[in-house]
Amino acid sequence: MESMHKAYKAIISSDWSECLAPCSPFDFISFNYPQLTTRLEAIFKQYTANHISLGEAARQIRKMLPDPITENQMDAYLDHSFSTYPGVPELIEWCLSKDILFMINTTGMAGYFQRICAKGLLPGIPLLSAHPMVRYPRQNSDPYHIYSLFEIKDKAKNTEAAIKTHQIPPNKIIIMGDSGGDGPHFEWGAKVNAFLIGSMTKPSLENYCLTRKIKINFKFGISRAQSQNKDLKKEMQVNFMDLSSCIQEVLL
């Protein structure tokens, strides 16, 4: 785990689900309670398209969940299903080696990332911004700081808090996302002149930015057109280490 006292030159604040990894934030629930899969998929699509709030999504999930997800249940899911897009762990490690603070900023659950860190499935993540609906007792393997994210707009608030804490200038910020749920984060990023990267860009993010005249500075991976469904085979051919040259040019 990276120290909170380390000096960083820059920051990347990135979404996780379908941005760095081919999963939804609720897959661990579907794994343990398969009967909820269809309803969970519908909720995910609704809030990433900005049709319902994240708070409303969390309320609906709490109501349908038979019991809280235990650490053992989360571990069983991770042992069976954890994956990222190719090159993501290496990219995180590369960023940290260049003194770039890598912050995962997601509507996913804090407990999911706590168990990922405990099992050593990713390099030490210094900062995490995630929903606390599933969160476990603190361990030494946890990110040194976990910001609570209750609504989509909290992504921007938590990134802003991180750059103030680490005294990172606006021209050293990259925001990365894939869907309309990242729209408010991109909107804030545009206001502070951050560099905006669409990763596996969905129409909902394209439309959000288009209607607000927000320029996505760089698109990486497979951009999905309005009529296209997810093509996991193509997505898994994208190597995220190829993004390092863009990051180096922008931040270093």
Predicted regions and their residues:
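C-terminal cap/substrate-recognition subdomain and adjoining C-terminal extension
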Residues: 86-90, 97-101, 108-252
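Alpha-helical substrate-recognition element adjacent to the catalytic core
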Residues: 2-131
